[in-house]
Each structure stands twice: as structure tokens, then as C-alpha cells.
Amino acid sequence: MTKITHEFELYGKSYRLETGELAKQATGAVVVSQGDTILLTTAVVSKERRDLDFFPLTVDFIEKMYAVGRIPGGYLKREARPSEKGTLTARLVDRPIRPSFPDGMRNDVHIVITTLSCDQVNQPDVISIMGASAALMVGGVPIEGPVAGVRIARAKAEDGSIDYIVNPTFEEAEASDLNLTVAGTKEYISMVECGADEVTEEDMIGALEFAQEAIGAFCEEQQKFL
């Protein structure tokens, strides 16, 4: 398979999607990055349809200490079960991806997101959603997509106006009174997760509308990549 790379910039931040070089035996594999935070996302789909009354989708988010230039310390120098953050990130990916599959899908689907590099500036969780969507679509899996996710923070300008920040850095998110994560397609929102400090209803609606617009932009970039 020929290596395909798509680089783009949205809302002041640089992104990269790449396929055709790693994990060639997977159904679909995409390396997604924001800055120097780099993730390998693989999707494997079984050929046989299982006789089940539920959709067997599994999402794993694997954090590697080498991604931040460290090795595990202590007596056991090996990485064991996922951290709480890893489990929550896997669920963050599962929630918007699961509804995108067709009704009656009973093939096993396993999505694995592995951190190759973490610059400790850009957050890896929301770009995992874009990586999972792109990996499925590269592999020809019939999903209703593309699917993308964004995190919205906000900052007050000197004139008192509010500026929304898409996929804020750790520092930008820490300074914001709004931490809104939204995922879906160009047409609809399928997942919302939020923490906020007395944000008005009007501001929340504005943030959701802005998030939907940003999701559409990321979906369009995935289509260019494919």
C-alpha cells in the first residue's frame, strides 16, 4: 500500500493523518498527530458475523511511558493494566464511534489507539476519535462517517469578548472555565461531555454550535485524506 499523508491546519493548530506505512495487516491503520503528540490507531474487523444480540466493539487506549521519554520505575519495569485516564479515553472514543456502525452489525471490531509520542502540550484524547474514524474508513468499514471530536475551551479577550479555543493545550484548558468535549458527524452531535464553572445557557449553546462547526471542518479534512 502506498504511503498517504495529509497535513492541515485548523483553528491555529497543525494536524497530520498518515496511512500505508505502519500496521499493514490491520483492516485499517492511521497515524494521527497534533503537534508532536502522535497516535497509532488500528482497526481490525472479523470477516465472520457472530450470532449475538449486541455489537461486539472493543476500544483500547494504550499509554506508553516511552511516549514521554521515560521507562516504568520500581521493581516491575513493565506496563500492566490501563490507567484510569486510558480507560476514560477509550470510552470517549467508543461513544461517538459505536452509533456510526450500521444496525445489525455483529462482526467483531477492535480499535486500538497507541501513544507513540506525547509532547505534554497537546491532549491526545480528542484526536483519538478522528484517528479511529479515519482507520475504519481507510479499511473500508461501512460506517456513517467521517466522525470527529473536538474539545472547546474559552478565553476572554482584552475587550471583554469571548474567544473559543478548539482542542486547547493542557495549559489553555487549565485556564478556561469551560471544558466541553463534543463528537459527531457533519450532520449531528452524538456525544457531549462537559465540565464548567457557572457558564450561562446562552454561552453553552454558542459553544455547542461552534463545536458542531469545528467537527464539520475536521470531517471534511478526513474526506480529503481518504
Protein language model regions, located:
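Short, Gly/Pro- and small/polar-rich lid/capping loops
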Residues: 1-25, 29-31
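Glycine-rich anion/phosphate-binding loop at the beta-strand->alpha-helix junction
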Residues: 16, 40, 93, 103-157
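Short acidic, glycine/serine/threonine-rich loops at helix termini
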Residues: 19-20, 29, 43-45, 52-54, ...
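Gly/Lys-enriched N-terminal cap/neck module of very large, oligomeric protein machines
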Residues: 20, 26-30, 110, 145-151, ...
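Glycine-rich, flexible beta-strand/loop modules in the N-terminal catalytic cores of phosphate-handling
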Residues: 26-110, 115-122, 186, 193, ...
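Generic structural signal for well-ordered, non-membrane alpha-helical segments
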Residues: 82-93, 125-128, 200-208, 212-218
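Mobile "lid/hinge" segments at catalytic clefts and subdomain interfaces of large enzymes
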Residues: 140-226
